[in-house]
């Protein structure tokens, strides 16, 4: 797994992840800036078979990466309307889940957008499994909790039904680590239990079921 970023930061400063496998590489949440240095670096790491993103806020540069490597662009059917820049060839659309490469599966969770997704990497965390979550599941600074965001700029939460849908979508998968959309923080261990526990805590706050002085 390789991280790819831009300095100084572009847009909201997200960090891309390159998942490398014996049958090709997946670029997840591509950064909003692409130049020859980045192309050479990714080519040296094996190039790209496919490009995708956790949600439409990170769709902007997918077409550029696709054209640079003649790679597939993968887009949830629910969010296809947000893909406004034409990729090298018609995008591959999917719903529910999509096995992209051996051990790498895209999982539609909903929440932030209808097609918001995570990538499950079975070989991550030393074989214990990892999620690449963008902000579908948002790792908090203490690296011991996660949260869920409806609109980050407007500071709006997700409703209970959406939180439960996100957790239910990832529940069948084995994972011990979560890489969010930025260099830090990373939820390094016990991630599945943390997601379940954090979701219940989040829902308690939505319902007002917290102490007067929490």
Residue ranges and their predicted role:
Residues 15-17, 96, 117:
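Residue-level detector of beta-strand structural context in well-folded domains
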């Amino acid at each position: 797994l390789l991280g790819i970023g831009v300095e100084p930061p572009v847009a909201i400063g997200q960090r891309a992840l390159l998942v490398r496998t014996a049958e090709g590489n997946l670029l997840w949440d591509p950064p909003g800036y692409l130049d020859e240095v980045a192309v050479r670096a990714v080519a040296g790491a094996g190039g790209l078979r496919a490009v995708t993103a956790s949600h439409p806020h990170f769709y902007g540069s997918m077409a550029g990466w696709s054209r640079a490597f003649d790679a597939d662009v993968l887009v949830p059917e629910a969010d296809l309307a947000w893909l406004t820049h034409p990729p090298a060839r018609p995008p591959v659309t999917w719903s529910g889940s999509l096995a992209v490469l051996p051990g790498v599966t895209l999982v539609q969770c909903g929440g932030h957008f209808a097609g918001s997704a995570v990538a499950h990497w079975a070989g991550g965390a030393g074989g214990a499994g990892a999620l690449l979550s963008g902000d579908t599941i948002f790792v908090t600074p203490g690296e011991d909790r996660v949260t869920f965001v409806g609109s980050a700029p407007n500071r709006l939460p997700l409703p209970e039904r959406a939180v439960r849908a996100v957790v239910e979508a990832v529940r069948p998968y084995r994972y011990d680590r979560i890489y969010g959309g930025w260099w830090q923080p990373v939820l390094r261990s016990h991630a599945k239990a943390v997601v379940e526990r954090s979701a219940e805590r989040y829902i308690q706050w939505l319902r007002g079921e917290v102490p007067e002085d929490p």
